[in-house]
From Swiss-Prot:
InterPro entries: PsdUridine_synth_cat_dom_sf, PsdUridine_synth_RluA-like_CS, PsdUridine_synth_RluC/D, PsdUridine_synth_RsuA/RluA, RluA_PseudoU_synthase, S4_RNA-bd_sf. Coiled coil: none annotated. GO terms for cellular component: cytoplasm. The keyword Lyase does not apply. It is an enzyme of class 5 (isomerase). It comes from Xanthomonas axonopodis pv. citri (strain 306). This is Ribosomal large subunit pseudouridine synthase D. It holds the Pfam family PseudoU_synth_2. Keywords: Cytoplasm, Isomerase, RNA-binding, rRNA processing. GO terms for biological process: enzyme-directed rRNA pseudouridine synthesis. The active site is at D145. The lineage of its organism: Bacteria, Pseudomonadati, Pseudomonadota, Gammaproteobacteria, Lysobacterales.
Length: 331
């Protein structure tokens, strides 16, 4: 166990003594037990870089321990010092000392990058909680596309981040989305198709045989005349996954600028619906529900983000168009 009294004054240096009952075990495995707040991959990197020392000397991850050795770890974390805190309003659904759950609006980019140097979610997070500057990626453990709205969880400590990333990797985080797609689907199903970069367009992803496995479960929420509202549950979390899978199934998401294709107007659509479909300028996709285990207590946490006004409006107009068409058919 770690001995708090032996901690050096520098908070970035962590120390511990290898317990006697760890004799015969690998250095990397024991290190992961001594410092569970860090991921195994990160600890392994520190061993290889010399930032994790055994009796003051470099060691290998596979080295066998005797018990009683001293361990010193120089905590080296990438930070977000290049991102400036900016006062951008955030809708908080849940928060405590370990996690922050927010409702991201459409139009907000998660990370600064080319074309979006600031005014991002990371800038907003650093303003709300400056301590996130010491957490890798400002605590972001998963992303939503710029024009996808909805619920996201942010880790406020390295320990929470490690636990949440492990849950995501183990597919233990439940993520449900609302999507409005082109076409009147008759049933739900599962899209099980690998995804990788598009071979020609580097801005896009595509279903590819040599891609990474990707699984999306979907079921009908509401069926309109020529569109369908779906509940989509992610089993994996590939870039643009739901958007790519729906386009692959020939039912692209309404308004999707990358995968939607040419605008398709239902025959006899009302003027209101024509206007709504032509002016809906983002993918009709909303991260509605997120469920995970609290990284410290282990208790289940469930957060839901209300359907935003633009998506509610789209569904209302689709509903009214369907009702009008049904009424005309009865005459």
């Amino acid at each position: 166990m770690s001995d708090p009294s032996a901690e050096p004054l520098d908070p970035s240096i962590r120390q511990a003594i290898v317990p006697d009952n760890a004799a015969g075990r690998r250095f990397d495995a024991v290190l992961a037990e001594l410092f569970p707040e860090f991921s195994r991959s990160r600890l392994s990197e520190w061993i290889k870089s010399g930032d994790a020392l055994l009796d003051g000397e470099m060691a290998r991850p596979r080295d066998t321990l005797r018990g009683g050795e001293s361990v010193q770890v120089q905590v080296v974390l990438e930070t977000q010092t290049h991102a400036a805190p900016q006062d951008i309003p955030l809708s908080v659904l849940y928060e405590d000392e370990q996690v922050l759950v927010i409702d991201k609006p459409a139009g907000l980019v998660v990370h600064p990058g080319a074309g979006n140097p600031d005014r991002t979610l990371v800038n907003a997070l650093l303003f709300r909680d400056p301590a996130l500057a010491s957490v890798p990626r400002a605590g972001v453990v998963h992303r939503l596309d710029k024009d996808t709205s909805g619920v996201m969880v942010v880790a406020r400590t390295v320990q929470a981040q490690t636990a949440l990333v492990e849950q995501l990797s183990a597919r233990e985080v439940h993520r449900q989305y609302l999507a409005v797609v082109v076409g009147a689907l008759v049933s739900g199903g599962t899209a099980n198709a690998p995804i990788d970069r598009h071979p020609r367009d580097r801005l896009k992803m595509a279903v590819r045989d040599d891609g990474r496995d990707a699984v999306t479960h979907y079921r009908l929420r509401e069926r309109f005349r020529a569109h369908t509202a779906l509940e989509c549950r992610l089993e994996t979390g590939r870039t643009h996954q739901i958007r790519v899978h729906m386009a692959h199934l020939k039912s692209p998401i309404v308004g999707d600028p990358l995968y939607g294709g040419a605008l398709k107007l239902p025959k006899g659509a009302t003027d209101e619906l024509v206007h709504e479909l032509r002016t809906f300028k983002r993918q009709a996709l909303h991260a509605e529900t997120l469920e995970f285990l609290h990284p410290v207590s282990g208790e289940p946490v469930r957060a839901s983000a209300p359907v935003p006004a633009d998506l509610q409006r789209l569904m209302t107009v689709l509903r009214e168009d369907s009702a009008r068409a049904a009424e005309l058919a009865r005459r």
